[in-house]
Amino acid sequence: MKLYGGFGSPFTRRVGVTLQLYKLEHEHIVLRGSVPEELERLQKFNPLGRVPALETDDGRALADSATILDYLDQLAGPEKSLTPASGDARTEVMNIIGISAGAVEKSISCYLSLIHI
């Protein structure tokens, strides 16, 4: 597998941490959508040009950290998965993840507006 994105992105970082926790062999390739020279290559894996993106061993491209984490949970199997497989426990975990991801996105947006990007 290949993980595309810089660890300056909290979303790339959460995928990288999960890959390490699951002990899944992967290559990390630093690509940033904010760098014009890297954007075109990144768009091959995520048409939106956002990180992270994951290229699976069979060549599929996955975009968005939530989608990638769901894929990694499936690879890890039910015994190792960080997310419950079903039921109320899964719903509660997914809700917490959604709120957390939204808070991070809002923080990044506020930061970027302060530095006028």
Predicted segments with their positions:
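GST-like domain detector, emphasizing the conserved glutathione-binding G-site
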Residues: M1-I115
